[in-house]
Amino acid sequence: MTNIQAFMKNFLGASPEWYKLAIVVFLIINPIVFFFISPFIAGWLLVAEFIFTLAMALKCYPLQPGGLLAIEAIIIGMTNAKHVKAEIMANFEVILLLIFMVAGIFFMKQLLLYVFTKLLVKIRSKIALSIAFCFSAAFLSAFLDALTVVAVIISVAMGFYGVYHKVASGNNLIDAVDISDDRKIIEQQHEILEKFRAFLRSLMMHAGVGTALGGVMTVVGEPQNLIIAEQAKWNFMEFFLRMAPVTIPVFICGLLTCFLVEKFKLFGYGEKLPDEVWKILSDLDRTNSEKMSKQDKIKLGMQALIAIWLIVGLAFHLAAVGLIGLSIIIFATSFTGVTDEHTIGKAFQESLPFTALLVVFFSVVAVIIDQKLFSPIIHFVLSAEENTQLALFYLFNGLLSSISDNVFVATVYINEAKAALTNGVIAPHQFELLSVAINTGTNLPSVATPNGQAAFLFLLTSSISPLIRLSYGRMVYMALPYTIVLSIIGLLAIEFILPAATIWLASLGLILPI
């Protein structure tokens, strides 16, 4: 092995050779285009390359390739470190949210696991269970991080799948076996196992879409919501009310879609929990409930009280979102007996890689601003009539968010809209409506692909996906009815409900114009 071969083996680790080569080519081309052709073209090239790294997140986590491209952009002068720092400081609350709120919810997983386990065992109707999962995921995602909600549901599904797989393989529950190996499955259990997989697939997808339905509603539902709220100067309640003319109709239609796909068994939905599996899981739940000590019950009670504090703290904006998250960490660890530094450290593992990636986003945003990359698009949109502007912003956001990361897309568009407001191109009232269009456009159509929704990508890359045969293509197919309904209802609400509803809410004094 030559030195160059050894270097390329190390470079970006286990990523495919073609992917490594593509990143190297990007790094070589960008300075040439910037210095000898056009900084504007080089800027767009960087944005396209960065979107490519996000779309290829399954090949390599975007932090490394995206970070290399961003560092090179700063070195060659597309932007500067001072501007990157300014972008980071302008969005510091989002960084606090990702660091502390996600970690805080980690210590409340026991309560969430308990709730979803009870739902699965107690509700026998598949339609009712699907709606309950979708609604619960939506409600939780309005206050908690969507990744955490999905992580909890994955934990429940993994636990139940593991239990049934062991029984179907003829093993005891305490046996350590490979649940990805189907070779020992008893012949008559094969069909039941396939039905159970289809059942779990549908539940996971309903819950995933639920996180999008709830996440769009509040400041803390998604990281990009807080970025938009910061620019528009909206607190928790005002953000909720501003979004409500769009998010409430979409939420109702989302639950209706959940009902219809289950009722008529469309797009891979409708499979019920086999009775044999339910009996095994029900017996296990009963055994676990009987084993629960008084100490365990007190832990659940404390976590429920902390959840109430979380909702009250956010609703009345008692502190910055990230600081409320820090208080959750302190309360949850203090009252459930978690005092070991290494155990506490595990809570931060989920959020810190994405927090680092977010800082790279801001570097690319700085390039977009310095090179005025979005000026032609924004000029085109803002030259349209005011009502058409809302639909165009919604559609452009939705299209880009379905293939790229929605935090990145929302940051770019809200910055451009704020610049238009500052320069007197649009009126304050129009900026407020555009902010709603950007938020809903970023959050709703992005359920189309795993690239658009972090929760979907997390589900796709989790260990449960291969077990229940949930591939990228199948996920896109199962999300299709939701994509169509959420996108169209969102667009219609933006066009026909939002302007009049905003004026009505302002007349009641529920929202305050800028």
From Swiss-Prot:
GO MF term list: sodium:proton antiporter activity
UniProt keyword annotations, A-Z: Antiport, Cell inner membrane, Cell membrane, Ion transport, Membrane, Sodium, Sodium transport, Transmembrane, Transmembrane helix, Transport
Subcellular location: Cell inner membrane
InterPro entries: Na+/H+_antiporter_NhaB (IPR004671)
Keyword Ion transport: yes
Membrane topology: Multi-pass membrane protein
Gene Ontology annotations for the cellular component aspect, listed alphabetically: plasma membrane
Catalysed reaction, written as an equation: 2 Na(+)(in) + 3 H(+)(out) = 2 Na(+)(out) + 3 H(+)(in)
Primary localization: membrane
UniProt xrefs under Pfam families: NhaB (PF06450)
Positions of transmembrane segments: 21-41, 43-63, 88-108, 143-163, 203-223, 239-259, 304-324, 349-369, 390-410, 448-468, 484-504
Family (UniProt): Belongs to the NhaB Na(+)/H(+) (TC 2.A.34) antiporter family.
Function: Na(+)/H(+) antiporter that extrudes sodium in exchange for external protons.
NCBIfam families: NhaB (TIGR00774), PRK09547.1 (NF007093)
Protein name: Na(+)/H(+) antiporter NhaB
Gene source species: Haemophilus influenzae (strain ATCC 51907 / DSM 11121 / KW20 / Rd)
Gene assigned in the entry: nhaB
